[in-house]
Regions:
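Long beta-strand-rich cores associated with HINT superfamily self-processing modules
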Residues: 530-556
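Extracytoplasmic/peripheral linker and loop segments enriched in polar/acidic and small residues
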Residues: 191-194, 428-443, 466-534, 556
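N-terminal lobe/hinge region of extracytoplasmic solute-binding protein
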Residues: 67-116, 147, 235-238
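Extracellular/periplasmic solute-recognition and catalytic clefts
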Residues: 245-256, 272-331, 441, 451
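Structural transition elements
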Residues: 362-395, 410-415
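Gly/Pro-rich hinge or "lid" segments in bacterial periplasmic/extracellular proteins
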Residues: 99-103, 173-194, 198-200, 204-272, ...
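Periplasmic binding protein-like
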Residues: 66, 134, 287, 297, ...
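N-terminal secretory signal peptides
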Residues: 1-25, 48-50
């Protein structure tokens, strides 16, 4: 029998042969278990698309300009928006890479190996990678980064992903303002993150975890030069294809290409992000006038305005990108779960999709698990029910409803449109919502602290990753302040189950908790789209809104 890196891979082959899983599911699962993409594609009788790219065919030189917000970046390990990561990722890189088909590959890693029980992950670092300033990338660099994001004093959202298999919570011996015990966290053992040799790192986990390679591509999980100690700006050292030469918050980011980059490309001489502000019309005008060559994102309204421009190509991809109207359960109006249930019953999802997205989406189910996620469990759908929602409010002590502020931002316009339709529908059950549309810079400061807020969440290939980031107790990105011990326990259990069918049985319980007790109203899953000038070559829209400028070129 052919030797595979994990004993479960032959089972996956049998399941694919029997039609129990699709070829794409096989590719996703087998590569997580350490099978190379080339080998996985060979098993399914396909050619790895990345092997077809020919650098010789790409035009060389020129400057590419993409319209995107340029936010303040305090520390790459704290990056909390895709736009911030796009600024950083041209300079600093990741150990892994999840492509637009949700297949995860080694990147700064040569390969990884995982034990049969999913508790030991051995990471083999490429030996040909050098930092821009000349030194080689080593295991010491990787260990420093992994330990840094595991430190609660840093505040990285990666900590929420590592909690449950590398990091454990403990009682800090103090009380918060409400008299509850304060929790902190730490690596579960001294050798949890272990240097094996100069190019090998081992993760010794206390619990099984299937999604480690995808966690290593979570957008704050950059590999930074320890000498920079988390600082980022012009001249920051990185292993990536570009050097940042200028960065002005709210205006632009400018780069020049490295000539000694270890990987593919870059083909451009220079690259630039142009901040076009909060007005969505500015993006349309910038494309029309050729002020920029493309946008990082364009919603359905913008696409409708630009699709007939003769120099423009439109790109679309189905995603697990969404938006949630999330409530703080520790606020008086939202403490009773019946209020949160009523808010969910108040909405007409199809109407929101047609009005806010011009139809470019599919209904969601208030649990942040998409049908495209391999562990999704189908639960009974529930329609809009105004009378039931009103009764729930009355039973919770609000027979006449209540009034509350909802924070959102004006750009992208689909978010504000969604807020307006939600407010109209909440009003039908007696809940008057005052929309507070803040300038983006102000919104970014309060997105986790506002008691009721509309927040967009990006695409992730596994639901367990999103749930860990967004709803695990005390996670840095737990903007809803949700805390449910049963939810946390089930999530940790799901993260260690290899077979997605078995995982979906646990996921059904998690989804039911979210629909019954959870903190969100989730109307839809969104089709992601953008535009590029037809002279831009090599662009392929990533479902996570990521920009990889070293892959792009400008046709002369």
């Amino acid at each position: 029998m052919e030797k595979f890196p994990h004993p479960y891979i032959p089972t996956l082959i049998d399941e694919m042969t029997d039609g129990a899983i699709s070829r794409r599911d096989f590719l996703r699962k087998s590569t997580l278990l350490g099978l190379s993409a080339a080998a996985a594609y060979s098993v399914v009788g396909m050619v790895d698309p990345s092997s077809l790219l020919k650098a010789a065919d790409m035009p060389k030189g020129g400057n590419l300009r993409i319209g995107m917000r340029c936010m303040e970046i305090k520390d790459p390990h704290l990056a909390d928006f895709a736009e911030k990561s796009n600024v950083i990722r041209q300079v600093c890189e990741y150990l892994t890479f999840t492509d637009r088909n949700n297949i995860t590959h080694p990147y700064l890693l040569e390969k990884w190996e995982v034990s049969d029980d999913l508790k030991t992950w051995t990471l083999h670092i490429r030996k040909d990678v050098k930092w821009r300033k000349g030194k080689p990338l080593t295991a010491d660099d990787v260990v420093w980064n992994l330990k840094r994001v595991s430190d609660p004093a840093i505040g990285s959202s990666v900590l929420g992903l590592f909690t449950g298999y590398l990091v454990q919570e403990y009682d800090a011996g103090e009380k918060d303002e409400k008299g509850n015990p304060k929790k902190s966290s730490k690596l579960w053992a001294d050798n949890a993150i272990e240097k094996v040799d100069d190019h090998t790192v081992r993760l010794n986990c206390f619990a099984p975890q299937i999604a480690v390679p995808e966690h290593l591509f979570h957008y704050p999980m950059f590999i930074l030069d320890p000498a920079d100690n988390g600082a980022f700006g012009p001249d920051a050292n990185g292993t990536g294809p570009f050097q940042l030469t200028e960065y002005t918050v709210g205006k632009s980011a400018k780069y020049k290409a490295r000539t000694d980059y270890w990987g593919k490309g870059p083909y451009l001489d220079t690259f630039e992000y142009v901040d076009l502000g909060d007005n969505p019309g500015a993006g349309i005008a910038a494309i029309a006038s050729k002020q920029v060559d493309g946008l990082s994102e364009a919603d359905a309204v913008q696409i409708s305005a630009m699709k007939n421009f003769p120099h423009v190509a439109v790109f679309k991809v189905e995603t697990t990108q969404t938006v949630v109207a999330r409530m703080h359960p520790d606020v008086d109006q939202f403490k009773d779960k019946r209020v949160r249930q009523a808010m969910r019953l108040a909405i007409d999802r199809d109407k929101i999709i047609q009005t806010s997205l011009l139809g470019a989406g599919t209904p969601a189910e208030d649990h942040h698990v998409a049908p495209s996620h391999p562990e999704y469990a189908a639960l009974p759908k529930y329609p809009r029910d105004i009378e039931k929602a009103k009764k729930l409010l009355a039973d919770a002590g609000y027979p006449n409803g209540f009034e509350f502020d909802m924070v959102t931002r004006p750009d992208p316009i689909w978010e504000l449109n969604t807020a307006q339709v939600l407010a109209e529908q909440f009003n039908d059950i007696g809940v008057k919502i005052n929309i507070k549309s803040l300038p983006s810079a102000q919104y970014w400061e309060v997105w986790t602290s506002a008691p009721f807020s509309l927040t967009a969440w990006g695409h992730r290939p596994l639901a367990i990753m999103t749930l860990s980031l967004a709803y695990r107790s005390n996670a840095a990105w737990n903007e809803s302040h949700y805390a449910n011990t049963e939810f946390d326990t089930l999530l940790t259990q799901a993260e260690g189950i290899l077979d997605p069918k078995e995982r979906s049985k646990v996921m059904a319980k998690i989804e039911a908790i979210m629909q019954d007790d959870g903190p969100i109203v989730q109307p839809f899953w969104r089709t992601f789209s953008t535009v590029m000038d037809k002279k831009v070559k090599g662009f392929d829209l990533h479902p996570s809104q990521y920009i990889f400028a070293h892959e792009y070129a400008i046709a002369v």
